[in-house]
């Protein structure tokens, strides 16, 4: 078996050839091709101009072409232009650095229109005498299913299954990151703690399905009123938090009031009975050392609102304590 194939399978970084064309004149290559056909990966060779000189049958099947028609074609012939940046950038990196490149490529093949993700390993092919990079050999593996599974697991680990908001773990992690940014950039940071009034009575009187409906409505309400650089999550039960970056406490209070009013106006029951919530609002203080400081104050403001008659919002003041 030719040295270049041995090196490619072992993943060695450098391949030296006198001429790429000799690969295809060698009668032994039919045996090598049998091995390439059974690898279950996409194998291809390109010259310095990005023109294909070889592709194994799996790659040809993806491109819906044959070995003869492939010759001289480039990635522009097989992938949509807006998907080529990752592919071409990796090729160029191989040509310029003379080093192997391992990266992920997200591409849509023109043949089937499907978005697939590939883990591509690209090795430079060097001229035996001059050491000039005269092409590359690539081995790509379709990892779409793995990436999708990874994303699903990430969602499961970070998302509340009922409301589809951040769960407690993800919420605290994002809150800590926002806290650090606010301290570093000396920007305001506000927190709204929200709790549905008498939620246990709703579950007891109307059932947990109705309670779930109320929670999901509130989650969608949050998503409809907060901007992209804010985030929210479910702390647990009927308690939620909204974190507003680069936002002063007065602006946060107005947002809390907007949420409270829209929630109170929604008729959850045929009897036209309404459900209410309370919110406590606080902001970053100069001496705060952790998100627990902000959260504690918003929680105190929340329970002051509940003590004062429910269905209201309260900003933390020193007198709140």
Curated annotation (Swiss-Prot):
Domain PAS as annotated: residue spans: 28-98
Enzyme class: transferase
Keyword Transferase found: yes
Active site (UniProt): 238 (proton acceptor)
Annotated GGDEF domain residues: 187-318
Catalytic activity of the protein: 2 GTP = 3',3'-c-di-GMP + 2 diphosphate
SUPFAM superfamilies: Nucleotide cyclase (SSF55073), PYP-like sensor domain (PAS domain) (SSF55785)
GO terms assigned for molecular function: diguanylate cyclase activity; GTP binding; metal ion binding
Domain PAC: 102-155
Residues the entry annotates as binding Mg(2+): 195-196, 238
PROSITE patterns: GGDEF, PAC, PAS
EC numbers, comma separated: 2.7.7.65
Key words, A-Z: GTP-binding, Magnesium, Metal-binding, Nucleotide-binding, Transferase
Bound cofactor: record note: Binds 1 Mg(2+) ion per monomer.
GO cellular component assignments: plasma membrane
The record's note on its domains: The disordered N-terminal region is not required for diguanylate cyclase activity.
Protein's recorded name: Diguanylate cyclase
Taxonomic placement: Bacteria, Pseudomonadati, Pseudomonadota, Gammaproteobacteria, Vibrionales
